[in-house]
Amino acid sequence: MTRMRDLVERRPFMLGFAGFAVFPASVRAELEPFKVFKSPTCGCCSKWVKYMRENGFIIRTKDVSDEQLMKIKNMLRIPLKHRSCHTGIIGNYWVEGHVPASDLKKLLASRPDARGLAVPNMPIGSPGMEMGSRKDPFDALLVLKNNRARIFTRHNIIR
């Protein structure tokens, strides 16, 4: 996965003093820094990054053009049907779209043999896509090495 590492950059990641005050060391220690590629004009992407930071993730963002973002998604071989508005890379996984922090923490704790997590289609009520009290059901998908996906977590399911 050298290409992923090259995208993330090998420089050390820093978390500001405020982050250390908010998140206990035990939480910070289990989280890896990651890089998020997004459009500079996408408000929902910025809201998702803010949400992830509030949940303890150390994120470096890189604003890129739509063309550059498509090249990154193609290089990572993210299936078209699972694509969304922003792409992150953490360790050997990619994170596509409005994936909840709890799902990413679960992925990092379990370390499945997979390529990444995806929440396609920007569902209303997913992190960064809040619209009042409306919360549409959505699935976070685990995309396996063969590009097949299975449901990793279901969200906003009415029972």
Feature locations, PLM:
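Thiol/selenol-based redox catalytic cores and closely related redox-interacting motifs
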Residues: 74-159
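Conserved helix-turn-beta segment immediately C-terminal to the redox Cys motif
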Residues: 51-60
